[in-house]
Amino acid sequence: HCFNGLCRYNNSGEFNVPFGTYARVYFPEEEIRQFAEKATNAIIACLEWQDTLSLVDFGDGVYCDPPYMGDEGSFTKYHHTDFTHAHQIELAQALKALNQSQGNPITVSNSIHAKELYADLGFIIHEIDAPRSISANGNRQSAKEIIAVLPEVC
């Protein structure tokens, strides 16, 4: 449980968010145990997204939560390597191709800035208001996001 749920890495690729100061630390032991029971058939791996997509089999559902797209030229370096606008396009096109070749249902969450990219590829777009607990300018209001969906192709 790091400060406000923030995920950040230094230039060496090491996680560098403080835990914060809490009078009582919440450790969700029961939720973790329930997840472990439900995830017995899940494969959890740490791979580049291209390698992950190469493991997708017919009938698998795919959910992607990439670093959120900003305006071109905006901050993209959440890790020691950044996820650029070109990477966003490459991922969206690869997901569309996977859906067309294998029929897998695809779901992607992203910022409102990615709406046109996914809509132009034929994804069904759902706009949502997502709560924020972190903000660079101190504004912790909700933000517009999208859930982009390609249904299973039979």
Model-inferred region functions:
Residues H1-T76, E90, Q100:
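SAM-dependent nucleic-acid methyltransferase catalytic core
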Residues F75-F83:
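Short, surface-exposed loop/helix-turn segments at secondary-structure junctions
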Residues T84-L91, Q141:
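Short amphipathic alpha-helix initiation/capping segments at coil-to-helix junctions
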Residues E72, K115-Y118, I134-N137:
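Short active-site-adjacent structural elements
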Residues F123-C154:
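Class I S-adenosyl-L-methionine
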Residues C46, Q88-P131:
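Conserved Class I SAM-dependent methyltransferase catalytic core
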Residues E31, N110-A114, E152:
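Short, polar loop motifs at secondary-structure junctions
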